[in-house]
Amino acid sequence: MTNILSPEKIENDQELPIRPSYLQEFVGQQQIKENLSVFIKAAKSRNEHLDHTLFYGPPGLGKTTLAKIISNEIGGNFKSTSGPAILKAADLAAILTNLEKNDVLFIDEIHRLNTAVEEVLYPAMEDFELDIIIGEGPAARSVKITLPKFTLIGATTRLGLLSNPLRDRFGIPMRLNFYNTEELKKVLNRASKLFDIDLTDSGSEEIAKRSRGTPRIALRLLRRIRDFAAVDGKSRVDKEISDFGLNRLEVDHIGLDSNDYRYLKFIADNYNGGPVGIETIAAALSEQRDALEETIEPYLIQIGLLQRTPRGRVITIAAFEHLKMPIPNQSHHQFNIFNENE
């Protein structure tokens, strides 16, 4: 699922020129920044490596950026890979043996590591040792290789899919949360200076309110609104051109697009608001379950239009009101579901 409001990184996203390099430049996630600053200073004062760190939460909130910032702050090299790219234990061994002291190894989508790779990672994280089997059959022998003290940073949008043994080996787990409007305005204002865009306060607020609490989406929308302004002969991005451009992009006043409406209307029209299983929704909308769970559902839940329950997905009364649809008489089913969870 690729669209203007996807929190996933897409090919034409230009984040590198505006990516902050140090914690003091990073906007939002204040508690995470403050805690990381303490942990980094403490590790440096003891001349130790930073504890292995796990960032989790919806996509587009800055997990990769924070990993690079940590690397800059502790003065190590930054090595990046992803769970799907490490197919076998030998792939991980090759990466680990090329690390130096204080290096940061960033593994995106770490929940997608297979079991064989995880088994190699455990002693590397705990004891900084790598067990390698040399030879085959009766002649095979195990050789231990000592690794330099490095910091592993994992990132995942699906914490529940991370195995317990792997999750427990991270000394610093941190959840990234959606941004509020004021934080997104700061992100946009910083980017507008780097992109040389004349962005007014009302323009940045309009874009921020419709960016689904996600900096990556806000920056993408800013670039598209700049295009509308340029073609319309406007030298600045104000509220008027922002509203015009966002309407053309079919982004409504709370950040919903056609995919969100398809999702909500399917449950409203066919299941009277729910509950309905995610597999049924995915099949009906011809979408992958993962795409719905990572791209659409988190924001709908955040703004109170959707709930996940043991019996399936349920849209709220607020969702019916936003869709301008009559609230079904059976709306008491939502309260029955809450009671089951108590």
UniProtKB/Swiss-Prot annotation:
Homohexamer. Forms an RuvA(8)-RuvB(12)-Holliday junction (HJ) complex. HJ DNA is sandwiched between 2 RuvA tetramers; dsDNA enters through RuvA and exits via RuvB. An RuvB hexamer assembles on each DNA strand where it exits the tetramer. Each RuvB hexamer is contacted by two RuvA subunits (via domain III) on 2 adjacent RuvB subunits; this complex drives branch migration. In the full resolvosome a probable DNA-RuvA(4)-RuvB(12)-RuvC(2) complex forms which resolves the HJ. Keywords: ATP-binding, Cytoplasm, DNA damage, DNA recombination, DNA repair, DNA-binding, Hydrolase, Nucleotide-binding. DNA binds at R289, R308, R313. Its EC number is 3.6.4.-. Residues 253-342 are annotated as: Head domain (RuvB-H). This is Holliday junction branch migration complex subunit RuvB. Pfam families: AAA_lid_4, RuvB_C, RuvB_N. Has 3 domains, the large (RuvB-L) and small ATPase (RuvB-S) domains and the C-terminal head (RuvB-H) domain. The head domain binds DNA, while the ATPase domains jointly bind ATP, ADP or are empty depending on the state of the subunit in the translocation cycle. During a single DNA translocation step the structure of each domain remains the same, but their relative positions change. The keyword Manganese does not apply. Mg(2+) binds at T64. Its main location: cytoplasm. The keyword Nucleotide-binding applies. It is found in: Cytoplasm. It catalyses: ATP + H2O = ADP + phosphate + H(+). GO terms for molecular function: ATP binding; ATP hydrolysis activity; four-way junction DNA binding; four-way junction helicase activity. GO terms for cellular component: cytoplasm; Holliday junction resolvase complex. Belongs to the RuvB family.
